[in-house]
């Protein structure tokens, strides 16, 4: 297996221009495809997940022009639901941000479309979304295991009253919200259980509004969406930098700055993961906010005990930053780590122990106590981009670290290690 050894880093200092947000990129692409008019998306993320969405849209007959560097995309809107005249199978890799929204959007009208993906995608639950779509009239079959992809979609979603479980993934609600305006009837979505990752719903509602559709949000418990609407292209849309990707660089600044500045996000960002910077500040780092940047300067870091439900992806970065904090750090309410690219709670606990940390892994929490000195280790990445990026922070010590399968960062940040090297001074 390919590996990359990072030598100890004495200091980090500099500016990182962030790649586009994965969450925003794939939502914007789908809405642009469903809308009336042509949309020009800039700062689009070039990554595996976005390529899977683009490939699916192309197979569905959507016309778009992509720049050579794949960060500018001109999408000719379809002016309504996406249809396939023939049977179609779409392979979506391990892209949850493509699988969930497409599973809903392709239930409009009548289709015969199979959505499938990598083996890990077939382990990521989709049952709650399918149940909700069926309540709205959709005809959906599981082709292998019940409640998991691959699924066959035969259309039929007309709206009405639907109930969706919000406790596993906010992407199920996102998928329903983006599809509902194009259904013939009004849709009332009621949430069962606690809604996880609320800020991701805010991204969805913001994008829908950008494309001309308002949703009545009743305290995140009920959402009322008028049917028989159409999305309207905003013309041009700038995709924000990826706030989850920012977390590694901001944490590096907190641990071994200098000052690290990330651009492309700022105090008014639509992404909830910018709140990660508040956690670093609470730990003792110095954080500065601008309209289009966040910067972080080294401070003496102390452990925190916090509920991380609102920033599940960026919270992983705190688990490795905890190796540099005084005391025991506890991250709570993170059950949904278990249904991401890999079981991230298990993976994180396993790999933190390799570098010498004392770790307690609960059903929905993790507790990390750093060792006196980090140990040299080979870090397994579980084909999970965030594991690879999180554990790069171990090199901000006097211990080198080896990352196995470093190219898995291609899911959201293909040149991550080059960017980290650019702001690093080796010990």
From Swiss-Prot:
Record field: catalytic activity: 3-phosphoshikimate + phosphoenolpyruvate = 5-O-(1-carboxyvinyl)-3-phosphoshikimate + phosphate
Primary location class: cytoplasm
UniProt cross-references to Pfam families, sorted A to Z: EPSP_synthase (PF00275)
Residue numbers binding phosphoenolpyruvate: 22, 96, 124, 171, 344, 386, 411
GO molecular function: 3-phosphoshikimate 1-carboxyvinyltransferase activity
Subunit structure: Monomer.
Protein name: 3-phosphoshikimate 1-carboxyvinyltransferase
Gene designation per UniProt: aroA
């Amino acid at each position: 297996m390919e590996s990359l050894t990072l030598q100890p880093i004495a200091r980090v200092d500099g500016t990182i221009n962030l790649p586009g947000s994965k969450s925003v990129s794939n939502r914007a692409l789908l809405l642009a495809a469903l809308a009336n008019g042509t949309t020009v998306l800039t700062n689009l993320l070039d990554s595996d997940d976005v390529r899977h969405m683009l490939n699916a849209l192309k197979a569905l007959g959507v016309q778009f022009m992509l720049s050579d560097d794949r960060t500018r995309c001109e999408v000719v809107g379809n002016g309504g639901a996406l249809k396939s005249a023939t049977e179609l199978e779409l392979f979506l890799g391990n892209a949850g941000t493509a699988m969930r929204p497409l599973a809903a959007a392709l239930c409009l009208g009548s289709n015969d479309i199979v959505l499938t993906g990598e083996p890990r995608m077939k382990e990521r639950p989709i049952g709650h979304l399918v149940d909700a779509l069926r309540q709205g009239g959709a005809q959906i079959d599981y082709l292998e295991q019940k409640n998991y992809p691959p699924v066959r979609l035969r259309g039929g979603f007309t709206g009405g009253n639907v109930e969706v479980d919000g406790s596993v993934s906010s992407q199920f609600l996102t998928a329903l919200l983006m599809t509902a305006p194009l259904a013939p009837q009004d849709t009332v979505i009621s949430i069962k259980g606690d809604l996880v990752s609320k800020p991701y719903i805010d991204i969805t509602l913001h994008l829908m509004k950008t494309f001309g559709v308002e949703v009545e949000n009743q305290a995140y418990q009920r959402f009322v969406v008028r049917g028989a609407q159409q999305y309207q292209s905003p013309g041009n849309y700038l995709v924000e930098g990826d706030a989850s990707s920012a977390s590694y660089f901001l944490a590096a600044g907190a641990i071994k700055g200098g000052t690290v500045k990330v651009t492309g996000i700022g105090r008014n960002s639509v992404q909830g993961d910018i709140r990660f910077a508040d956690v670093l500040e609470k730990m003792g780092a110095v954080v500065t906010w601008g309209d289009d940047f966040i910067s972080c300067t080294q401070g003496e870091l102390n452990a925190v005990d916090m509920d991380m439900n609102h920033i599940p992806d960026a919270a992983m970065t705190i688990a490795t930053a905890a190796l540099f904090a005084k005391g025991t750090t506890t991250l709570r309410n993170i059950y949904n780590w278990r249904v991401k690219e890999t079981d991230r709670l298990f993976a994180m606990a396993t790999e933190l122990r390799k570098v010498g940390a004392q770790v307690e892994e609960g059903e929905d929490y993790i507790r990390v106590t750093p060792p006196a000195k980090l140990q040299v280790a080979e870090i397994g990445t579980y084909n999970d981009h965030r594991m690879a990026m999180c554990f790069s922070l171990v090199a901000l010590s006097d211990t080198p670290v080896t990352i196995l399968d470093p190219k898995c960062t291609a899911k959201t940040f293909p040149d991550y290690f080059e960017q980290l090297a650019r702001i690093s001074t080796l010990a």
